[in-house]
Amino acid sequence: MAFGNPYDEAYDVDMVMHWMEKLAQVGVRHFMPSDTVGLADERAIEVLYTPVMKEFDQYEVGAHLHTAPYNWRLKLDMAYDLGVRRFDCAILGYGGCPMAKDELIGNMPTEQFINYFGTRVLSKSFSIEKFASAMRGAKSIFG
């Protein structure tokens, strides 16, 4: 819960960085600060990732952002502009936290990520044909 806490418990950027440092001390090398219920806006992303990307520049730091259909691009723009190069995504944006107050909130949609960046940023092993097949399957399941 890197951008707020739906349980009304204490939260701040220093706390996130404190726990990232503790995890780094025991050998964790990859971090994915998470916007578990879609609280982050561009300013919150900037406030968190500006110090994180400086302090943890020797680590792989990504983003697990929950979005609504109208704000995924704003969040992706800000995180990418701050140096984030690894993003969690889900086909059709499915998944998310049941604590989110807005039922439109879900994971970053993989298809929007691909449309935004094109295939140039994807792993060499990524197959657009297999992804298209998975999209068709997801649409047949979820409607």
Protein language model features and the residues they cover:
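Catalytic cores and adjacent flexible loops of soluble metabolic enzymes
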Residues: 1-143
